[in-house]
Amino acid sequence: MGHTSSIACAHRLRSGLITEKEFTAVAAEADWPDAYRINQYVRFEGDDEDAIDALSGFQRFPAWMWRNADVLDFVGWLRNYNEHRHSHRVGFYGLDLYSLHASIRAVLDFLDKVDPDAARRARYRYACFDNYGEDTQAYGYATSFGLNKSCENEVISQWMEMRRRAADLARRDGRDSRDAFFFAEQNARLVKNAEEYYPSMFHERVSSWNLRDTHMAETLDALVHHLGPTAKVIVWAHNSHLGDARATEMGQRGELNLGQLVRQRYGKDATLVGFTTHSGTVTAASGWDSPC
């Protein structure tokens, strides 16, 4: 996130793109279900009473990356901006894949409401992870070294079922069903990709990095498609994700990144903007592992 002055500059850029250039969404280097809670708050669709509550979903380290005063200010600003816009309200979404278990719960919550039989099938498939509790690294280690069977077939089957039944499931939850299904479907995609990601962490770094940024690019593509032809998305992430890896040592190591994939996909419709400094030091957090 960087120093407060850098964040303040970034806030001015984001708010200017929204108010002056009519950007329609912010997609952040944040976990999908946690960011979607903010999306519901700023679009007047959720149950949270204030921005502090909306940010409370961010529990995973480093929670302070998103649960801080600067993000709080931006979330409050975005809600105020949307207040008198009864249509085309600007949304807030997450691109990252570290929320495997939260995403499983989100899929099950959606299916419980629209199709209990499908929910039972999903619970049976996702029970493959039960032996590991919430410890995704234990799952990655055990499956990476062949100590236990992976859940690959189960998560792919669940995602494919939701894709296959998209039209049916999206019609079952009333007028907001399209957004509700999209949220659930992206959580199922996240579970599928995270299942592959965690074992890769115990092998070469290039593999896990590429899986993560490819997931971000897939999620961004899905979001753009969901928002429609007028979508204009601000992507909020670290320089290492947003630059074009082909122009750096990353590319020489065989790494790709979100900026590269977006530029390859959207060409001149994508503009990559990064922050750098000439000299000095930056404090990213006042307390690295202190509670928010």
Task: Set out the residue ranges of the language-model regions.
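Structured catalytic-domain cores with a bias toward divalent-metal coordination
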Residues: 1-292
